[in-house]
């Protein structure tokens, strides 16, 4: 009886009381555990290794220098060589582009900030003049004078954005820091209107505009600023495309022909030259008769002396 009573009591207590680990009010265990967010791995570009590409190019060239290489295998290796060289060229260009972007990023940022500030100021000045109560003739004259300055400011702004990324950046506002002292010294003089001061500051800091400034202006008219930024234009003042489709095909074909001719000439040179073993054997054959002739002369001279000695010995014993 006591055992049965204890079992019933234990079962009753288990049914009425809850576990200590389950949902106590005011405790931290009452909240379910939060699941950790699993972030997907970032997609990393697997760019080819430059050293690996160079090694493959050396191996293929070494294989093409063999004289006994079959024709079909030679064609396959020449195509592989052209592909490896193209991959190497693209990878080097990509690395150069990335390096130039990192190098001139801050300078371009400062120039873009200054150019956008000046452009906004000139546009604000133009709006003020157009909304002012001036004579139509005077208003037209001022707007015409301000239009050239706005155009120069727009070219400056596009210059800082669409300058070719793969070329050395020439700053427009490089002389601004040098002229801070001069401007502070001349600040006591009566100042001109804000727009005129800003436009003169742009012209002074620009100085002799770099050649790319005219290219940017031409590309603004043609609508090819994106191509200029990516380096797909030749960078001349005309702004024409440097890599057109037919010219690319012709140049590529000519380079392939030159490469094939170079490989063919190198193989012919290798075939004309004797191998290492033949050169060594030929050298030995050429040197061997010279050595034998010298030794024969020494041998015969030694034999003559020996004959004289024998004759003298014979005469001595005879005596």
From Swiss-Prot:
Basic and acidic residues compositional bias: what residue ranges? Answer: 1-13, 230-275
Q: Does the keyword tRNA-binding apply?
A: no
Q: Where is the composition biased (Basic residues)?
A: 276-291
**A cellular component annotation (GO) from this entry:** nucleolus
Provide the coiled-coil residue spans.
49-131
Q: Name one GO biological process term.
A: maturation of SSU-rRNA from tricistronic rRNA transcript (SSU-rRNA, 5.8S rRNA, LSU-rRNA)
Q: Into which family does the record put it? A: Belongs to the EFG1 family.
Q: What is this protein called?
A: rRNA-processing protein efg1
Name the source organism: Aspergillus fumigatus (strain ATCC MYA-4609 / CBS 101355 / FGSC A1100 / Af293) (Neosartorya fumigata)
Q: Which gene encodes it?
A: efg1
């Amino acid at each position: 009886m006591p055992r049965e009573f204890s079992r019933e009591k234990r079962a009753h207590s288990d049914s009425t009381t809850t576990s200590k680990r389950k949902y106590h009010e005011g405790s931290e265990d009452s909240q379910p555990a939060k699941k950790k967010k699993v972030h997907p791995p970032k997609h990393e570009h697997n760019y080819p290794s430059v050293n690996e590409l160079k090694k493959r190019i050396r191996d293929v060239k070494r294989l093409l220098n063999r004289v006994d290489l079959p024709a079909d295998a030679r064609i396959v290796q020449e195509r592989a060589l052209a592909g490896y060289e193209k991959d190497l060229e693209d990878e080097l260009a990509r690395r150069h582009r990335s390096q130039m972007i990192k190098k001139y990023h801050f300078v371009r940022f400062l120039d873009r900030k200054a150019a956008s500030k000046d452009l906004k100021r000139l546009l604000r000045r133009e709006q003020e003049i157009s909304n002012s109560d001036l004579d139509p003739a005077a208003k037209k004259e001022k707007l015409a004078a301000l239009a050239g300055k706005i155009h120069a400011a727009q070219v400056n702004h596009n210059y800082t954005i669409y300058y070719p990324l793969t070329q050395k950046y020439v700053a427009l506002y490089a002389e601004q820091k040098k002229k801070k002292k001069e401007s502070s010294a001349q600040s006591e003089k009566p100042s001109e209107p804000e727009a005129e001061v800003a436009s003169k500051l742009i012209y002074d800091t620009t100085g002799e505009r770099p050649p790319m400034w005219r290219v940017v202006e031409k590309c603004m008219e043609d609508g090819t600023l994106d191509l200029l930024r990516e380096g797909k234009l030749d960078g001349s003042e005309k702004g024409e495309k440097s890599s057109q489709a037919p010219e690319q095909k012709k140049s590529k074909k000519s380079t392939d022909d030159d490469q094939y001719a170079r490989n063919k000439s190198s193989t012919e040179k290798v075939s004309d030259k004797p191998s290492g073993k033949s050169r060594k054997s030929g050298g030995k054959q050429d040197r061997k008769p010279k050595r034998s002739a010298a030794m024969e002369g020494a041998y015969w001279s030694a034999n003559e002396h020996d004959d004289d000695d024998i004759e003298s010995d014979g005469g001595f014993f005879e005596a």
